[in-house]
């Protein structure tokens, strides 16, 4: 409902190459989270949507980005907490199209849902 108050395009699909932002309630290892991180997309807390909707406009993303604040009592290491911010900044600085740019990888796995997920992840993150 809150997204409808703001000018945006909501992508609900297995393909999300054109995504610019991902809203995540918590850090996780999902395909979408990993792909967004490796592609240098903004990964933001749900408060970004809530506060932007209350303001009636999109707010600056910086303070809502995962990795902006590192929690000491988190089940996730500081490296994991800071990964979205670090990768976004690194890819912006270097101009690389993704975290795995120029990697050549062979996946020796059976074809199933999990392999489909890895293939989509490689497509999104500049993996060859």
Which residue ranges define each predicted feature?
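Short, conserved beta-strand segments within well-ordered enzyme catalytic domains
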Residues: 23, 42-44
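Short, well-ordered secondary-structure micro-motifs within conserved domains or adaptor modules
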Residues: 16-29, 128
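Phospho-regulatory, Ser/Thr- and acidic-rich intrinsically disordered linkers and terminal tails
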Residues: 1-8, 31-34, 38-39, 46-128
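The feature marks the first
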Residues: 1-13, 17-22
């Amino acid at each position: 409902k809150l997204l409808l108050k703001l000018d945006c395009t909501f992508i609900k699909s297995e393909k999300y190459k054109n995504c610019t932002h991902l809203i995540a309630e918590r850090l996780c290892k999902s395909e979408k989270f990993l792909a967004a991180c490796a592609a240098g997309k903004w990964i933001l807390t749900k408060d970004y949507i809530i506060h932007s909707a209350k303001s009636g406009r999109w707010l600056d993303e910086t303070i809502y980005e995962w990795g902006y604040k590192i929690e000491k009592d988190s089940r996730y290491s500081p490296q994991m907490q800071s990964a979205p911010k670090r990768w976004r900044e690194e890819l912006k600085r270097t101009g690389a199209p993704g975290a795995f740019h120029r990697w050549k990888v062979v996946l020796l796995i059976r074809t199933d849902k999990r392999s489909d997920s890895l293939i989509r992840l490689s497509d999104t993150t500049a993996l060859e």
